[in-house]
Swiss-Prot record:
Family in the record: Belongs to the three-finger toxin family. Short-chain subfamily. Aminergic toxin sub-subfamily.
Keyword set, alphabetical order: Disulfide bond, G-protein coupled receptor impairing toxin, Neurotoxin, Postsynaptic neurotoxin, Secreted, Toxin
PROSITE patterns tied to this protein: SNAKE_TOXIN
Tissue specificity as recorded in UniProt: Expressed by the venom gland.
Keyword Disulfide bond: yes
Record-given protein name: Adrenergic toxin rho-elapitoxin-Dp1a
InterPro entries recorded: Cytotoxin_Cobra, Snake_3FTx, Snake_toxin-like_sf, Snake_toxin_con_site, Toxin_cobra-type
Main location, first listed in the record: secreted
Annotated compartments: Secreted
Entry function: This toxin shows activities on different G-protein coupled receptors. It is highly potent on various alpha-adrenoceptors (ADRA) (subnanomolar affinity for ADRA1A). Order of potency is the following: ADRA1A > ADRA1B > ADRA1D > ADRA2C. It is also found to reversibly bind to muscarinic acetylcholine receptors (CHRM), but the affinity is much weaker (CHRM1 and CHRM2, Ki>1 uM; CHRM3, Ki=140 nM; CHRM4, Ki=120 nM; CHRM5, Ki=350 nM).
GO molecular-function term, one example from the UniProt record: toxin activity
Gene Ontology CC annotations of this record: extracellular region
Disulfide bond entries: C3-C24, C17-C42, C46-C57, C58-C63
Source organism per UniProt: Dendroaspis polylepis polylepis
Length: 65
């Protein structure tokens, strides 16, 4: 599985997930109105959203773009 780890105006950076980590995730952490801190990567289980987080998990290559 290949997941996106970062995305910018220059393109995307990806990583091949290690054995046991079969999900890609994207976490949007609310900072201030219209501003989010976005984290992406591989996980074994989908994280539970905390505070003002929004989490998307998926199982296909680069699905967390």
């Amino acid at each position: 599985l290949t997941c996106v780890t970062s995305k910018s105006i220059f393109g995307i950076t990806t990583e091949d997930c290690p054995d046991g980590q079969n999900l890609c995730f994207k976490r949007r952490h609310y900072v201030v109105p219209k501003i989010y801190d976005i984290t992406r990567g591989c996980v074994a289980t989908c994280p539970i959203p905390e505070n003002y987080d929004s989490i998307h998990c998926c199982k296909t290559d680069k699905c967390n773009e």
